């Protein structure tokens, strides 16, 4: 397939979770060795090595961050728990900015009780609480709908249309939707 789109890897990004057993360094070096210029990082791997080391490894290998997973996880039973989740999203936005990443992937959070409508409202309220901070740091918020089988524990946002509806209601160009073909 000479000259085909498959020869151009300039827009291909590796989701770090596909190499979850690797350290951040191993994943970034693996991208570099494979000719990939982009990686989607996971926060747990950033935290394992620290933000400064992550930045160094990325720079040393010429690999850029396409997105950081995961922010979100907004629904909670108490106001204090919701605020703790919002505060964690502020830290995630800071991590994006420090790694020159313009997109925080939001896995919105599962069902803390039996009130699906309230959980979805808390998702929108949570995004609204962080959007101005994201704008100030030039970080986009990408709402990722997950397959409905994950509604109980990972995300009460299960469809593309639900994601688009939330983004539209928030009304900021900084809020959009990211899709993982596994979930749609």
Predicted feature locations:
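Boundary/entry segment of secreted carbohydrate-active catalytic domains
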Residues: 2-24
